[in-house]
Amino acid sequence: MVDEQLRPRGVEAQAVLAAMAKVPRHRFVPPPYTRLAYEDRPLPIGHSQTISQPFIVAYMSEAARITPGAKVLEIGTGSGYQAAVLAEMGAEVYTVEIVPELAKRAERTLEELGYRSVRVRSGDGYQGWPQHAPFDAIVVTAAPERIPQPLIDQLAVNGRLIVPVGTQTEDQRMTVLTRTPGGIVEQKTFPVRFVPLTREKPQEH
């Protein structure tokens, strides 16, 4: 996967390549799809969610510029694979998943594989995880129509927020926000297609 899919597409960070060579992606894929686990394609994981294709995971991990000991927030745990890659790179990972069943499954898989530096919580990712802010990097694995302000607020100085932005009917763009000492710098990159970032429904009274 690393030599055939990632290096040829420009992924160069050795920490990313080493992490993705080590994390067993097939453990994060439902049984009907395990034979496809190492192909460069997204795969369904249930509840209308997917595990991102390896290149996207590699790109987001590289763009986040993770260093050992970095505190990283992930929005959209999904299968737990992205969190495992970040943990393998030495990050302390806080990950939020809105679907309780996926959060439990991911937490179980991560525990079985020994990733003790990952904390999983079920909840609304739009709000981030303010109790543990600020974060050196924030990785969002589903697409909001606009970047949630709470996530920007929880980014440390010199931190980077990696997020696909756009609607399901119009273009989505992978976007990198950097909080510099002078303010926020935004860079839009290539077009992508992600599932929407969903929110908790308001309580009816």
Swiss-Prot record:
GO terms for cellular component: cytoplasm. The active site is at S52. GO terms for biological process: methylation; protein modification process; protein repair. Its main location: cytoplasm. It holds the Pfam family PCMT. Its EC number is 2.1.1.77. One of its GO terms (molecular function) is protein-L-isoaspartate (D-aspartate) O-methyltransferase activity. It comes from the Bacteria. It catalyses: [protein]-L-isoaspartate + S-adenosyl-L-methionine = [protein]-L-isoaspartate alpha-methyl ester + S-adenosyl-L-homocysteine. SUPFAM superfamilies: S-adenosyl-L-methionine-dependent methyltransferases (SSF53335). Keywords: Cytoplasm, Methyltransferase, S-adenosyl-L-methionine, Transferase. InterPro entries: PCMT, SAM-dependent_MTases_sf. It is found in: Cytoplasm. Catalyzes the methyl esterification of L-isoaspartyl residues in peptides and proteins that result from spontaneous decomposition of normal L-aspartyl and L-asparaginyl residues. It plays a role in the repair and/or degradation of damaged proteins. Belongs to the methyltransferase superfamily. L-isoaspartyl/D-aspartyl protein methyltransferase family. This is Protein-L-isoaspartate O-methyltransferase. It comes from Gloeobacter violaceus (strain ATCC 29082 / PCC 7421). The gene is pcm.
